[in-house]
Structure formats: C-alpha cells, structure tokens
Amino acid sequence: CSSDLNRIITLGDIDEENANDIIQFIHEINYLDAEKTESKREPITIIVNSYGGDIYRGFGVVDAIKDSVTPIHTVCYGAALSMGFIIMASGHKRSASKHSTFMYHEILWSLNDEKLSSHKREVEEGKRIMDIYDSIILECTNLTKKQLDIVKKEHRDWYMSAEDALVYGIIDEIC
C-alpha cells in the first residue's frame, strides 16, 4: 500500500477545501504526466480516512478520479463511511488496512425552511442525488440494487469490515 510520496494526498471529511485540494492535485499530476504514456505514469494515492461529508463536493472528487488518465489508487486506513465510501470505491485500484471500516447508508438530506412548493423541488433533488450515489456504487462494486434498497428501506447504516469490502468488490485487496 505504498507509493511515491510526491503523489500521495489524504482525504478526511469531505468539505469545500478538502475536495478542491484533491481535485486540483489530480489535475496537476495529470498535467505533469501529459507527455507520458498511460503505462509510464506513476499512480496517485488517495489515503481515505473519512466519515463522509458534502455529497456534491464528493461527486466532484469521484468525477476527477474517473477522468484521471494517471491511475488513482485509493487506500483506506480507518474509515470510509458515507461519501468516503463512494470515493474509496471509485479508485482505479483499491486497498484497505485490515481494521478498516466501510459504511453505506441512504443520503442525509434536509429541507430548507421555505414554502411548500420548494420542498417538492428539494425532495426531487434528493432522489436524483440518491440515484447518482447508488449508480456509482453499482458501477464500482459487486453490491446489488436489491442490497442497497434493503438498507434504505430499513433506514439503517450498513457497516462492513475490510473482509466484507473485499467480498463485495469495494476493494481489491487488504494490505
């Protein structure tokens, strides 16, 4: 689970600053690697120890990972919960320490104190975001829509060990 120290960045809880730093870092490394063939590029390592955070900013990190020509390895040390789970699963190569914990749940979405008509739009947006969230998981892992729907129906958090994450295709190896 090691890499070139100049290509390692840490992801904690996802907020504006942290997400923007990671997106910028990925783009800078891709710019520096532009003359190299894909096979000659040293990977970027994102160390994940995150309880989650801002979903929109997290989607920005996921898109930067997916768009990166330079390979991105995500490594979990500690926790990959909520949006941290999605980012962790989005890596091109994914590994975790043996005591890492992963967690999936329905997104947390609050309604603003506005008029009733505004609430309908907020609920529609929440559903749209939940669909994106789940589609990323279904694309990057072996989890099924049925498994995700059960968790949402039961309104619970689904915690998984590193061994579980390996079985479900959330990670590729335990290091």
Question: Which residue ranges define each predicted feature?
Answer:
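Terminal-region recognition feature
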Residues: 1-175
